Amino acid sequence: MGDNGDNKELKQKLNFSYSEEEQEDEGQKEAQESKKVQYHTPERCGHQDSEAKFTPPRTPLNHVCELSTPQVKDRASPDQGLRTPVSRPHTRPETPAPPDKSKPPPHCESPFTPRGHSSQSVISTGKLPSRGSKHLRLTPGPLTDEMTSLALVNINPFTPESYRRQFLKSNGKRKTRRDLEEAGPEEGKVEKGLPAKRCVLRETNMACRYEKEFLEVEKIGVGEFGTVYKCIKRLDGCVYAIKRSTKPVSGLSDENLAMHEVYAHSVLGHHPHVVRYYSSWAEDDHMMIQNEYCNGGSLQAAISENAKSGNHFQEPKLKDILLQISLGLKYIHNYGMVHMDIKPSNIFICHKIPSDSPVVPEEAENEADWFLSANVTYKIGDLGHVTSISEPQVEEGDSRFLAKEILQENYQHLPKADIFALGLTIAVAAGAEALPTNGTSWHHIREGQLPNIPQDLSKEFYNLLKDMIDPDPVARPSAAALTRSRVLCPSLGRTEELQQQLNLEKFKTATLERELKEVQRAQSSKEGQSSPGVTGTHTGSRSTRRLVGGKSAKSSSFTWGQSSP
């Protein structure tokens, strides 16, 4: 009986679904054995103490979510799955240590069957449900915790106010930080308890995400505000461009400057002529931005290569660049923003990679998807100087491409400053000499005179470039007007002509259909005015023709010459 009891006890201990509820009568014995295990495994205890010591501070909400969803935590730290068994302390399987009630149960250290896992979750969370992560996110908590959480949420300045009020109020169940800040006097208690705006980047700092998720290939660019690296994401195997800010984020002012580009990217979304944004995070007090990788480099690099060989972009290519960037600017301006730093180094080139699958001829159905057939795509990048048109906070870009009215702090026509910079960018791509940063030559260009271009351009195209740098911003064409320019789209006139002809033919067809319906209506009215007797006779003759007429002729052809029975 003693051996059978020991075997039964051993099986129960080896069964990982064995919970505390099933061993209440042996609690004292298990407590003694747990002390022995702790003495035999000092490294494990030291390791847990060190983890508890260096664990970053967490809000109670996040702490409870981690206890209720340990599997999510395991996925977020892939290094735990890569540890070798040597690094783990050796413990006897016959003496599993029960969880310490003074500390959260270590879910990630021992496997559990669903039964044991659920029982441990219920014990660890107390009155909270086992699936508390979703429950806690959707259920409003105490007002103080809610305000603390809202203090760690940025407000995107480029989000339209109507959109923000419509979608961020959560049907009145949960208020945003701005709603709490704009509360009336009757809610004075809420205003007094509102925490100060905190540095979200520093509070949400992520350690070693760059090294864990990406493989750095090479450095592809260095700018005033950051360094760009070509990286491969370990999970999906795709290539991305990761931008790391040069200066660390040390306060709210630095955070706002670092977040400016992220705000603009997140609101703009995806457009074929704007460098695509994927993700951003703070790491070691530096801003990290994950963007689309453009395999053709920058337009400035291409211009430098052409200058070495004595070549320049020819007029057809210049028109293509101008048209594509105009489409990107039109998209940005329609969102109520301006770039404010258009120049060759902020325009990037993407070469279409040929597919291994058989090529299927495709026809662009509208103006929006014509770029799918283009072998080279030009995109606008580096949105660090983007500002709002309605509430401008202008930070001057490169003085070589800066419009004069911006220096005079005239912000009434901000989109036209992008047009001015784009005109000079095309002139540089055409082979113009290096632009001045100040002096007489600088003012000469601001008077509407293009720099010397070492190639002959068509009169229409040259005049278009001059219009783009007109001293009067009102006289400059808009980005939308450039996309409809006959100079950039010669086929646009033919398309409009064909469209007019098509509309004319549609009108003629509609007129004929209307006349036909009137004739049919008149004919049906005449038939309705006939007498009932005539109508009955006509109907009878019609039914006779239907039953005998046509079909009898066909049957007679088959029975011709045969005698009837």
From Swiss-Prot:
Annotated compartments: Nucleus
Residue window of motif Nuclear export signal: 317-331
Region Disordered, annotated ranges: 1-142, 169-189, 518-565
Taxonomy of the source species: Eukaryota, Metazoa, Chordata, Craniata, Vertebrata
GO cellular component, one term: nucleus
Tissue and organ distribution: Ovary-specific.
Coiled coil segments of this chain: 495-521
Family: Belongs to the protein kinase superfamily. Ser/Thr protein kinase family. WEE1 subfamily.
Residue ranges of every copy of the Protein kinase domain listed in the record: 214-492
Additional notes on this entry: Continuous activation of WEE2 is a cause of meiotic failure of small oocytes. In mammals, oocytes with a diameter less than 80% of that of full-grown oocytes cannot start meiotic maturation.
Residues that hold ATP according to the record: 220-228, 243
Gene3D superfamilies in the cross-refs: Phosphorylase Kinase, domain 1 (3.30.200.20), Transferase(Phosphotransferase) domain 1 (1.10.510.10)
The protein, known as: Wee1-like protein kinase 2
GO biological process: female meiotic nuclear division; mitotic cell cycle; negative regulation of meiotic cell cycle process involved in oocyte maturation; negative regulation of oocyte development; positive regulation of phosphorylation; regulation of fertilization; regulation of meiosis I
Database matches in SMART domains: S_TKc
Catalytic activity: L-tyrosyl-[protein] + ATP = O-phospho-L-tyrosyl-[protein] + ADP + H(+)
Record's function text: Oocyte-specific protein tyrosine kinase that phosphorylates and inhibits CDK1 and acts as a key regulator of meiosis during both prophase I and metaphase II. Required to maintain meiotic arrest in oocytes during the germinal vesicle (GV) stage, a long period of quiescence at dictyate prophase I, by phosphorylating CDK1 at 'Tyr-15', leading to inhibit CDK1 activity and prevent meiotic reentry. Also required for metaphase II exit during egg activation by phosphorylating CDK1 at 'Tyr-15', to ensure exit from meiosis in oocytes and promote pronuclear formation.
Main location: nucleus
Residues of the active site: 341
EC nos: 2.7.10.2
